[in-house]
Regions:
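Ankyrin-repeat boundary/linker signal
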Residues: 559-561, 593, 626-629
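Conserved hydrophobic site in ankyrin repeats
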Residues: 530-531, 583, 616, 652
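Ankyrin-repeat inter-repeat connecting loop/turn
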Residues: 556-557, 590, 623-624, 659
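Conserved ankyrin/ankyrin-like repeat signature
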Residues: 526, 578-579, 611-612, 647-648
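Accessory alpha-helical/coil subdomains and C-terminal extensions
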Residues: 7, 13, 35, 40-149, ...
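Start-of-repeat signature of ankyrin repeats
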Residues: 511, 564, 597, 629-633
């Protein structure tokens, strides 16, 4: 779903990788602060004064005015620091490590490329938590896809020291990234992780599990050719990732490369030299970027749990991958399965088959009986394991768990994640391995229902219109005359006919209006009708309901055209608790902002709906952005303090505000 505010805030976590490397005598090497300096010098990535071509080419008149103003004249590097550019806001960023090149907690100055760079002051605010204010960069203003208003993306770059080649990434680094996101979760709208390509799919898979109850966009990206080269893919990859992160709420850990956004736990690196380096053979892309940015909303996961976001900070290192090969012996298998190994990803032949050697099967069975979790996936790039063959059934009988169509990277990181949870037994881990926790595998396809007949589709549309009439007239007090039409008169006219596409289009036009009307009336029956009619898609991928109506973010997040408010905004504003609970259970996004930059939590707190504030906070909502910066929250709290209204102050406190006496 598109975020609504004049500016979106994105934290870029720069871990290293080819994207920011330079050529040296030893080949490509990372260079500290090169990436930030380069992005700051390029107008498409940093246009604080809005004096670039990108900010002034929305119309011919705008371009001509800009061209004649003299602002289009190239500026020398000596004059690049203008008052307006140097006074850009800094953004408060937290990290699990000291921020800066020296690792000290005081301001530092060091020489870089014959220039002196002053590092921001870094403070240790708690055990293992450091805080600093980083200079921000801001993109040119651009039109939000699908809407008429414009937005800029303001971002800060949290650069690791040292920068890592992705081949040196370890499990502790995955946990560190997750911790950085958790520390900054309430301060930013989205997160972009810059990473080397070699192990990017391992990191994206791991983060998909470590980031529990995620409600914001997290995108990993990088490049095959560094930004320092004239011809590169770094510009498109980074700009595309920033554009998606700043304009859409896609609450998943994803990977963006070569104009495509993939689910992070569905990809593998397929080429070391193509710009199209990543493939997702068993799941379609979430976003395709061409002339238009096309989001495949029906495939985007929706958060339906009423829990706040948290980062899990432990992975079990006692896992490994074993690729079967013809002639493998039981001794080889036992060597892999020996302690301290607790989990094995077994890459099997074809659809889950293995050699029938008794010593190999005995090694697998003994390990499973001893508590080792073995997950079978296919060596094939595309496809899934199944029990159709006898050679696959023997593995299942030995205790091996089918892993469906998971990638090797996903299976390994999922196994490591589950084994790191002390509350889970080996049997529970085996059970969870075969279930889609983050959309990482395709569940068995249920039998398809019979195609609806023309009469069924007419009935569905009639039901929709009946609900619309009922809700529209529910507040009227005057009697409405009833018009009775006899059966003969009804039969005299032909029934309303039309194609399935026409009916779907009609429903798509009516459902958002009906949805908002039901929520405003606190009509849970009408709300449930809308959700069912829209074919609410669960995380398992099973579509329920009678119609397939595609609305960005799902019908549960449909926006009012005038105010940009979602149904959750309306329910929170009206104090309709039952609708709030139903919307959250159906995947409503708590971080959506309307045209004024407000969240549902802000409206609930402003209206004094304490119960709804508690419910939204428990679901992960937080105040931020324009609500704090424009002074809306501060003014409301100060007015309550001045009036001595402790009840109102308490509601804002429960919403996360710390009143100043």
């Amino acid at each position: 779903m598109e975020t609504r505010s004049d500016e979106a805030r994105v934290l870029v976590i720069y871990t290293g990788g080819t994207i920011g490397m330079l050529v040296s005598s030893r080949g490509y090497v990372p260079e500290p602060y090169f990436l930030t300096d380069t992005l700051r010098s390029q107008k498409r990535f940093h246009d604080p004064l809005q004096d670039s071509l990108f900010s002034n080419a929305a119309s011919v008149e705008g371009y001509r005015e800009w061209s004649n103003s003299g602002k289009s004249t190239p500026i020398s590097s000596d004059n690049v620091t203008t008052p307006g550019a140097s006074n850009q806001p800094t953004l408060l960023v937290r990290s699990s490590r000291p921020v800066g090149s020296t690792g000290t907690l005081s301001p530092s100055i060091f020489s870089h490329s014959q220039r002196v760079i002053e590092q921001p002051e870094c403070r240790n605010v708690a055990d293992g938590i450091y805080e600093t204010r980083l200079p921000s960069l801001v993109t040119p203003r651009s039109v939000v896809p699908g809407h008429g208003h414009t937005k800029r993306i303001r971002y800060a770059i949290l650069e690791w020291n040292p920068l890592l080649d992705s081949s040196n990434m370890e499990m502790d680094d995955w946990i560190r990234i997750a911790a950085e996101i958790e520390l900054n979760y309430t301060s930013f709208d989205a997160f972009v992780v810059l990473h080397g390509t070699d192990t990017m799919s391992y990191t994206s898979s791991a983060l998909s599990f470590l980031l529990e109850d995620l409600g914001k966009t997290v995108i990993l990206t990088g490049a095959q050719i560094p930004l320092s080269q004239l011809r590169n893919d770094a510009v498109d990859n980074l700009l595309g990732a920033l554009s998606i992160a700043g304009n859409y709420i896609i609450p998943e850990c994803s990977l963006y490369f070569n104009h495509t956004l993939y689910r992070g736990n569905r990809v593998s690196k397929a080429s070391s030299y193509d710009l199209n380096a990543f493939h997702s053979p068993n799941f379609p892309p979430l976003v395709n970027v061409g002339i238009d940015i096309v989001v495949n909303w029906n495939d985007v996961l929706r958060q339906t749990s009423l829990r706040r976001f948290r980062a899990h900070k432990e992975m079990s290192p006692h896992v490994a991958t074993l690729r079967l090969f013809p002639g493998m012996t039981g001794a080889t298998a036992r060597a892999f399965l020996a302690p301290p190994t607790r989990g094995i990803v077994l890459e099997t032949f074809g659809a889950g088959n293995a050699s029938q050697r008794p010593d190999v099967l005995a090694a697998f069975k003994d390990a499973c009986d001893g508590g080792v979790v073995i997950v079978a996936i296919s060596q094939c790039i595309k496809g899934s394991v199944s029990g159709d063959y006898e050679t696959g059934q023997t593995l299942i009988q030995a205790g091996v768990v089918p892993g469906g169509d998971m990638t090797p990277e996903c299976a390994l990181t999922k196994l490591s994640y589950l084994l790191a949870k002390p509350e889970l037994t080996a049997a529970e881990v085996r059970s969870l391995i075969g279930l889609p926790l983050r959309g990482e595998l395709t569940p068995p396809v249920p039998s398809l229902p019979a195609a609806p007949s023309s009469d069924d589709m007419n009935t569905d549309l009639s039901g929709l219109l009946s609900q619309l009439v009922r809700l529209s007239s529910s507040a009227r007090k005057t009697d409405i005359p009833q018009i009775v039409i006899g059966e003969e008169a009804q039969d005299a006219a032909a029934p309303w006919s039309g194609t399935a596409a026409e009916r779907a289009s009609t429903e798509a036009a009516l459902l958002p209006f009906l949805m908002h009307l039901a929520v405003a009336r606190d009509d849970v029956e009408g709300l449930e009708f809308c959700l069912t009619s829209a074919g609410t898609t669960s995380c398992s991928g099973v579509t329920e309901g009678t119609a397939e109506v595609v609305v960005p973010g799902g019908i549960v997040n449909c926006l009012d055209a005038g105010s940009g408010r979602s149904p959750l905004h309306v329910a929170a504003l009206k104090g309709n608790m039952r609708c709030v609970e139903k919307l959250l259970e159906s995947g409503a996004l708590v971080h959506l902002r309307d045209e004024l930059g407000h969240t549902a939590l802000y409206y609930a707190a402003r209206q004094g709906h304490a119960g709804i504030v508690d419910t939204l906070v428990s679901a992960g909502a937080n105040l931020g952005g324009m609500e704090n910066e424009a002074g809306y929250v501060g003014l409301a709290v100060q007015n309550a303090v001045n009036a001595g209204n402790e009840a109102v102050v308490e509601i804002w406190r429960r919403a996360g505000v710390k009143p100043v006496d």
